From Swiss-Prot, chains A, B:
Function, as annotated: Involved in the biosynthesis of theobromine.
UniProt-recorded Gene Ontology molecular function terms: metal ion binding; S-adenosylmethionine-dependent methyltransferase activity
UniProt similarity note: Belongs to the methyltransferase superfamily. Type-7 methyltransferase family.
Source organism per UniProt: Theobroma cacao
UniProt keyword terms in alphabetical order: Magnesium, Metal-binding, Methyltransferase, Transferase
Pfam families: Methyltransf_7
Record protein name field: Probable 7-methylxanthine methyltransferase 2
Length: 367, 367
C-alpha cells in the first residue's frame, strides 16, 4: 500500500524530551528573522481598497504543528494589528486564528498552549480554532481568509516522488533525499512533485482568500540552482548514513532504505516564483531568500541539540518506515557522525528560507 | 484552591472500554429524538429576511465532546441544508462547523473521527474546525454564527454551587447533588448557579450570532417543579451511595465526599424559559420537554451498560476529587446497587430533555 503522507507527517507529539514543543528552536529563529515581512503583510490589509475597516480579521496558519511556533506567529499578527490600528486610530477588529495541520497533529497539546497567548493579550478580542486537514485540499469557506500564513510547512510534499526505473527498481539506493550521487531522475522526480504540490496549495487557497487577502509563505529552501547543495542535503545525507549503518548491523532491511524517499523539497526562490506565475491566482508582492547561520558558534552549536532539532520533525516519518524500535539507535548514530563532522567543520552551516508575500488577484474573487 | 471546572469537566478520552466514544449511546438517542426540531431550525435559516441566500453557513456545536455524537449532529445539519436547498432550488452553501469544547476535551480523537463524515458527504463543501474554550465566555467573532447548537452540554455549570453554612461547613453531607434529603439551601444554591451560568451562555452568544441566527439548546432537565424528583437525582444518589460505601471501607475521606457537589443542573422547562426571558437577547421560537424511556426493556436495559453510560461522563470529575485509583471500585459498587434496584424496579426510568429554539432579536445586531 502506498504511504499516506497525511498519516505520517506530523511533528513529535506531547512535550517530552524529543518533542517538537521542546526542540523546534530553529523554526522560532526563522519566525523571528522573518517577522518584519509578516508584520508588513498584516498591516497592508488595513491600507487597501476596503470600503470599511475590517471588523474581523481571519487568519490561517497552514501546517502550524504545535508548541511555541504557532503561538509566536499569533503574537506577531496580534501585535502588528494593534500597532497599525493605533497608527490609524481605528477600532481594533476581532481576530480569528485558524490553526491548520493534518489530523495526526497533536491538537490537544496545541490547544493547551493557547493559555500563554490568552494571558499575553487579555485586552484583544481574538479566537483560535484548530482546522484539521491537508493544505493540498480545501480547508476554509470561500472568500473567508484575510491572511494565510505558513512557516516551514509547504515544503512538505503530498507524497514522496516516485523514483524508480522502468522495471520498478529504486533509483536512489542508500539515500533518502536528493544527494550529490543521485541520478538526474531523482532531482527531476522531486522538482516535479514539488511543482505539482505547491501549485495545489496555491490553487486551493485562491478561492478561500478574501478580496485583497494576503499569503505569507516561508519555506525551507536553497540558495543556489543546484538542488544537491550541501546546506540542504546535509541533514538527509546524515540520516541516510546512519540508516546505512543500521542496515550493516542487520537492524533494518536494505530494501526498506533503498525504496524510501522523504516527501520534502527545498526549492530555490526561482522555482517558487515560477510555480506562482504559472498557477496564476496571485501577484507576488515580495520575494526573498533569507539565510540563517547555524552550527559553529551560532544556533545548534551543540551536535546533541541539533540532533534533537532534526529528530522532532523527522522521527514520525522515519519511525513509520523503519520501526519505532530503531529510532534511538538511529539518532545516536547520527549524533556520533555529526559530532565528528563538527570537529572537521564538515557540517552544514546555513539554513535557507524562501519567503514570499502574495496578494490574491482581483479577478480571482469567487462568488 | 477552588476546583476549576474547565480542567476537570470533559468526557472520558480515547476510544477504550470506558470511553465516551464507546458509551454515550443515550446522547445519540436524544439526538435522534430531537432531530426534527434541529432540522426545522436549520431550514428556517433559508426562509428569513436574508436579501441573498447564504453562501456560507457557520455552525457551532457547544460542548461537542467527541465520538459519534458531534458527527451525528453534523450529519443532521448537512442533510437538512441539502434537503432545503433541493426544495428551494438554490445553490448549496458551504458549511463551516465549529466544534467547541473545553481545551481538556480529546480533540485529537474527535478530529480523527471526521473522516466518517467526509466519506458520507463527498459532494458537499463543508469544513470542520475545533474551537477550544468555555461557552461561559466568548468563543467566536461578532455576527459570525448562523446556527449555534448544543446537545447535553449547557446543563454543566461553570463551577459547583457554594453550599456551606455561615461557618463554612458543608450542608450537603453524604450527597453530591440535590437529593430528597438535601436542605433548601442546596436547591437554592444549584438554581442560582444555573441561572447565572445559563444566562452567561446566552449573553456571550448574543453578539456572536449573525442577524436571524438560531440557537438550538438541548439540556438534560426535569419534568416537574420538584428539583429532587427521582428521575434526575437517581444517578447522583446512586454514585453518592457507592461513594459512602468507599468511605465506610476507609478508601476515601468522608470530608472529601461531604464537601463535594457536581457542577451540573437539571432545569425544568419553566426555569430555562425564565432565564431566556430575563436575559433578553433572544426570542423563543420553540420550547418543549422531551421524555425518553430508559431502563427496563428500553435503552440501558442492562445495568452494566448503564454504568458505562454514567461513567463515561462522570469519571473525569469524580476521579479528580476522589482519585483515579478508586474509580473501578466505585463503579463496580454502583453497578451492584443498580442491579439490585433493577430487580426491585427502583431505578430511574425516564430521561428528560429540555429543548429550546431561540432566534436572535433583531435589535441585538452588533456592529
Amino acid at each position: 500500500m502506498a504511504m499516506k503522507v497525511k498519516d505520517i507527517v506530523f511533528m513529535n507529539k506531547g512535550d517530552g524530551e524529543n518533542s517538537y514543543v521542546k526542540s523546534a528552536g530553529l523554526t522560532l529563529k526563522v519566525i523571528a528573522k522573518t517577522q518584519p515581512i509578516v508584520q508588513k503583510a498584516v498591516q497592508s490589509l488595513f491600507t487597501g481598497t476596503h470600503s470599511t475597516p475590517l471588523q474581523v480579521v481571519n487568519v490561517a496558519d497552514l501546517g502550524c504543528a504545535l508548541g511555541p511556533q504557532p503561538l509566536e506567529s499569533m503574537s506577531i499578527v496580534i501585535e502588528s494589528i494593534v500597532e497599525k490600528c493605533g497608527e490609524l486610530g481605528c477600532e481594533m477588529p476581532e481576530i480569528q486564528f485558524h490553526l491548520n495541520d493534518l489530523a495526526g497533529n497533536d491538537f490537544n497539546t496545541l490547544f493547551k498552549g493557547l493559555s500563554v497567548v490568552q494571558e499575553k493579550y487579555k485586552n484583544v478580542s481574538w479566537f483560535a480554532m484548530g482546522a484539521p486537514g491537508s493544505f493540498h485540499g480545501r480547508l476554509f469557506p470561500r472568500n473567508s481568509m484575510h491572511l494565510v500564513h505558513s512557516c516551514y510547512s509547504v515544503h512538505w510534499l503530498s507524497k514522496a516522488p516516485k523514483i524508480t526505473s522502468e522495471a520498478g527498481l529504486p533509483l536512489n539506493k542508500g539515500k533518502i533525499y536528493m544527494s550529490k550521487t543521485s541520478p538526474p531522475a531523482v532531482r527531476e522526480g522531486y522538482l516535479s512533485q514539488f511543482e505539482e504540490d505547491f501549485s495545489s496549495v496555491l490553487r486551493f487557497r485562491s478561492p478561500e482568500l478574501a478580496p485583497d487577502g494576503r499569503m505569507v509563505l516561508i519555506l525551507n529552501g536553497r540558495q543556489s540552482a543546484d538542488p544537491t547543495e550541501k546546506d540542504i542535503c546535509y541533514l538527509w545525507d546524515l540520516l541516510a548514513e546512519a540508516l546505512s549503518y543500521l542496515v550493516s548491523e542487520g537492524l533494518i532491511d536494505e530494501e526498506k532504505l533503498d525504496s524510501f524517499n522523504v516527501p520534502y523539497y527545498n526549492p530555490s526562490q526561482e522555482e517558487v516564483e515560477r510555480v506562482i506565475d504559472k498557477e496564476g491566482s496571485f501577484t507576488t508582492e515580495f520575494s526573498d531568500t533569507v539565510v540563517l547561520e547555524i552550527g559553529g558558534k551560532n544556533a545548534w552549536s551543540d551536535p546533541g541539540l541539533r540532533i534533537k532539532g532534526y529528530r522532532c520533525f523527522s522521527e514520525p516519518i522515519l519511525s513509520h518506515q523503519f520501526g519505532e524500535e530503531v529510532m534511538d539507535k538511529l539518532f545516536d548514530k547520527a549524533e556520533e557522525i555529526l559530532a565528528e563532522d563538527y570537529k572537521q567543520g564538515k557540517e552544514a552551516t546555513k539554513n535557507i528560507s524562501i519567503v514570499v508575500v502574495l496578494k490574491k488577484k482581483t479577478n480571482q474573487t469567487w462568488t
